[in-house]
Amino acid sequence: MANCFGEEVDIFKLDTMSRYVGKEKKREDLAREASRLSNEDGKNDKATKYVRDLKAWYGKGVTTLCLIYNQTGDTLRYVDTVDWFGYIGQTPYPTEIGNGQWASFLHVKRSGVSSGSMAGIVYRGKDKDGRERDFMLGWSSPWGAFYRNKAYCEVGNVGSFSSRWDDLYRLVSNADYTWNAKDNGRSSVHASIGVPSSSLFIAYVETPFGP
């Protein structure tokens, strides 16, 4: 995908590292190296520049500059989304985010409407034990100086978010600048958003790993 940045951290990449040569590679190992290499070759910087360039092209108006980093040890695949306010900008949500890749996209307000950018997106991946899990990420960049930005995230069973959008709207609306979600030590998500209007929303989808 054009809006995914970085070389995928896969088994072939681990084979080039002395720590893993001749050894069995586990999902935990892939997650560890994805975490360690989060800005390899400046990929985080490139993803950030990309979404800032999208914002510059879009111009004035409330937006959310979204970055997602995959350090689960497996591929994240797009499942579903909802736009409570606004819509996806010039580039689409990536259908897949490889392990060790940054996804970068812009969510924008509707022109001529006194509302901001507020949406939720679901990606599907695997946890530490190889079970499929759904990861929900939500953000709110309101229109108007009297409202605060919000970041939210959850880990759930496959398909568990599709019937909960009304509930998730309430949860995102009452979230904070940072949010953490854990799944019994098998997976986790961390999401954050800046304070100013049109801030970066940054989410890390993670599989836990040892030293």
Task: State what each model feature region is.
Residues 1-211:
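Intrinsically disordered, low-complexity segments enriched in small/polar residues
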